[in-house]
Amino acid sequence: MGKVIFISGIDTDVGKTIATGIYAKKLMEQGCSVITQKMIQTGCKNIADDLLVHRKIQGIDLTEEDLQGKTCPYVFEYPCSPHLAAKRESRKIEAKIIEKSTALLAEKYDYVLLEGAGGLMVPYCEEATTLDYIQLNNYPLILVTSGKLGSINHTLLSLEACRTRGISVLSVMYNGYPEYDLLLVKKPNAI
């Protein structure tokens, strides 16, 4: 049975997808079999956009599991939080369906890197947040952060939330995306 590692971030657009793809590639280079999974994807149709990015970084084609929908059991067209996207499409997100997909992947691969949607506290369904899901499944976490304004606060709050809930944080990955405002970097006293 493979090891499942959950990858989440301090916010949306913090670079979780890039970090997930890079970590998957690193594990592959170490000789491990690895698959990435997207818990829920909003803002696209059919194959989850984030999986396409993962596969490009990994240097592989879409997998059989991608084409079967196992690596992203829920895809919604409207770009918003998962619970709202599901509501707009009159669908219900069930944790058991995601868990079943993850378990099937873990039977085949050494590592399953399960990427969340948005930040830790985003509701993935009407009843629960991503943090609830991580805690319920006792997944270890890689937290992705960045250098954007407010990230120190968001990172510390996220780590505190994990500590309070007994979630094991394997590492904090700093992602250089988005890039710093060049004016602030070159002339920090200009503002």
Swiss-Prot record:
This is ATP-dependent dethiobiotin synthetase BioD 2. One of its GO terms (biological process) is biotin biosynthetic process. It comes from Haemophilus influenzae (strain ATCC 51907 / DSM 11121 / KW20 / Rd). SUPFAM superfamilies: P-loop containing nucleoside triphosphate hydrolases. It catalyses: (7R,8S)-7,8-diammoniononanoate + CO2 + ATP = (4R,5S)-dethiobiotin + ADP + phosphate + 3 H(+). It is found in: Cytoplasm. Its EC number is 6.3.3.3. Catalyzes a mechanistically unusual reaction, the ATP-dependent insertion of CO2 between the N7 and N8 nitrogen atoms of 7,8-diaminopelargonic acid (DAPA, also called 7,8-diammoniononanoate) to form a ureido ring. Substrate binds at residue 42. Pathway: Cofactor biosynthesis; biotin biosynthesis; biotin from 7,8-diaminononanoate: step 1/2.
